[in-house]
Amino acid sequence: MLHQDDEKEKFIFDIFNPMELDDVITTHKKVTALGKEAECKKLRNALIILDDVADDPRIARNEKQIHELYFRGRHHKLSVLISAQRYRSIAPQIRTQCTALFVFRLRSHLELEAVLEEVSATYDKKTIAGFYREATEEPYSFLYIRLEAKKPEDIFWERFEYRLLP
């Protein structure tokens, strides 16, 4: 069993630093490789949270690194959660790799249109807009969209609690 000493190993970073992110990714790849070599039944997962960074110029300069996380991270048991004030500020290549969306009340109709456009393969935009209004009606509530759901009725949720159906 591999253990982490939280006193010695930094795991929360207040400022985006591509070199520190590289260190985290490299370390986790090594941990995953060791687990595979030892034939561990359960490999360790890691979650990287990029909070409100979509407009951060350091992210734009290191877009390749972020794309790599989204495209290859799952092979190394790395998950990524990115939060943004504007949906469209997240690169389309990253949005297509997402497995879920959490859509809180949006400030712009253009942002809502962008979300509706990208998730309207199963239901029409009007239906999904209704789901959005219902899910975000209460303060702090959100529309949870399971992009990898196998059945249409499992895609749209109000928070994690109520399935939304037409």
Q: What annotation goes with each model-predicted range?
A:
Residues 2-130:
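Conserved P-loop NTPase motor cores
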Residues 39, 62, 111-166:
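P-loop NTPase motor core of the ASCE superfamily
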